[in-house]
Amino acid sequence: MNGSRQYILAAGGTGGHMIPAHALAVELMRRGHHVALVTDERGTRFPELFKDVQIHQLPAGRLTGGVKGLFQAMRNIWAGRERALTLYENFTPAAVVGFGGYPALPALLAAFKAKIPTVIHEQNAVMGRTNRFLAGRVDAIATAYHQVDRLKKRYRRKTEVTGNPVRDEVLFLRDLPYPPLSDNSIFRILVVGGSQGASILSEVVPEGLGLLPLHLRRRLQVTQQCRPEDLEKTRAQYAKLGIPADISTYMADLPQRLGWSHLVISRAGASTIAELGVAGRPAILIPYPAAMDNHQYANARELVSAGGARLIDQRRFNPFELAKQIQKMALEPSALKNAAARARQVGYPDAVEKLADLVERVGGNLPQQNSIEEDSTFEKNQEGAVA
């Protein structure tokens, strides 16, 4: 599309919302557009992702906490809507793009009031609350998966499968081969627990790796993300087992570490699944059972069905089960390489381009293209989804 435009991205302040918003911001600016971000207080803690982007904090509210909590949430949402309307008078966006999370709600409500074109992007395989509420009124819906539970059938005509955008540093891994692996070479495992780590991984993974056969355990080199309170205990466990391990609470170079890894052990957040697919890395996934609408189980199903990952329910996640699954995947180097290739097949390396194309079309008032109304794969996969 010719001509520079302005776009507003609205996202909740967690990594699952902020990372795809960041990727789209970079792509839109690469195309010569101007971008502003609307988020909550949590979202302002990601300054490294939005160095060249205006960041505006809106009041928003969670629709919980009984009558009193609901009343306060509605007041905050209304205040956020009014503040967003003022922002739109000065910034004049061609479109407003919502990535879910409560801060996206007042931003999109203001866009409806101002008659600004709107797009929502759903990162998970289950439509989130905010996006479900907005889906009927937006101009277009972008999804990360063909099968999205709780996406109503009547919205298919305006829905496109774009995939989940990932950072440029992860896209770089797409063209790199799977790291060389033999029966005697170093076997690198990356353990990540989402944006804040996961204590259960710190409890189970070191002990599970310690149960592996000696000839396999001697080859291990571990990189693990931990919560701050688990850091020293986890380091001590690995030291006791004699397993080289780099333990930290935050990994600024996570894409590079992903590129070195032969196997990933992680939760099944949307960004993690997207990065595994783009990079082509096999994984053992432990979905977070308390995730809203159990969406991490749904996120994992495509990668698991393709043979790129194994899933362990958290109720069965113990050192013995982990050691068993690692041995099934790792005793033959060719098995891990095959799993990596299968993971790569379900990646969406062009997700950010597809999403940016959609946003430009909607922002330019151009006809919608490539909807999934007649997509037979989508039709088949949506059977059984909640309507």
Swiss-Prot record:
Q: Where is the composition biased (Basic and acidic residues)?
A: 377-387
Q: Where is this region: Disordered?
A: 366-387
Q: What keywords were assigned to this record?
A: Cell cycle, Cell division, Cell inner membrane, Cell membrane, Cell shape, Cell wall biogenesis/degradation, Glycosyltransferase, Membrane, Peptidoglycan synthesis, Transferase
Q: Provide the family line.
A: Belongs to the glycosyltransferase 28 family. MurG subfamily.
Primary subcellular site in the record, as a coarse category: membrane
| Positions bound to UDP-N-acetyl-alpha-D-glucosamine | T14, G15, G16, N124, R167, S195, Q296
User: Which CDD domains does the UniProt record give?
Assistant: GT28_MurG
Q: Does the keyword RNA-binding apply?
A: no
Looking up InterPro entries in the UniProt record yields:
GlcNAc_MurG, Glyco_trans_28_C, GlycoTrans_28_N
Q: What is this protein called?
A: UDP-N-acetylglucosamine--N-acetylmuramyl-(pentapeptide) pyrophosphoryl-undecaprenol N-acetylglucosamine transferase
Underlying gene: murG
Q: Entry's PANTHER family?
A: GLYCOSYLTRANSFERASE (PTHR21015:SF22), UDP-N-ACETYLGLUCOSAMINE--N-ACETYLMURAMYL-(PENTAPEPTIDE) PYROPHOSPHORYL-UNDECAPRENOL N-ACETYLGLUCOSAMINE TRANSFERASE 1 (PTHR21015)
Pathway in which the depicted protein is active: Cell wall biogenesis; peptidoglycan biosynthesis
- What EC number(s) would the UniProt record show? 2.4.1.227
Where in or outside the cell is it found? Cell inner membrane
Organism name: Zymomonas mobilis subsp. mobilis (strain ATCC 31821 / ZM4 / CP4)
The answer to keyword Acetylation applying to this record is: no
The enzyme's main class, written as a single word, is transferase
Functional summary from the UniProt entry? Cell wall formation. Catalyzes the transfer of a GlcNAc subunit on undecaprenyl-pyrophosphoryl-MurNAc-pentapeptide (lipid intermediate I) to form undecaprenyl-pyrophosphoryl-MurNAc-(pentapeptide)GlcNAc (lipid intermediate II).
User: GO molecular function: any one?
Assistant: UDP-N-acetyl-D-glucosamine:N-acetylmuramoyl-L-alanyl-D-glutamyl-meso-2,6-diaminopimelyl-D-alanyl-D-alanine-diphosphoundecaprenol 4-beta-N-acetylglucosaminlytransferase activity
- Which reaction is this enzyme known to catalyze? di-trans,octa-cis-undecaprenyl diphospho-N-acetyl-alpha-D-muramoyl-L-alanyl-D-glutamyl-meso-2,6-diaminopimeloyl-D-alanyl-D-alanine + UDP-N-acetyl-alpha-D-glucosamine = di-trans,octa-cis-undecaprenyl diphospho-[N-acetyl-alpha-D-glucosaminyl-(1->4)]-N-acetyl-alpha-D-muramoyl-L-alanyl-D-glutamyl-meso-2,6-diaminopimeloyl-D-alanyl-D-alanine + UDP + H(+)
Q: Which HAMAP family match?
A: MurG
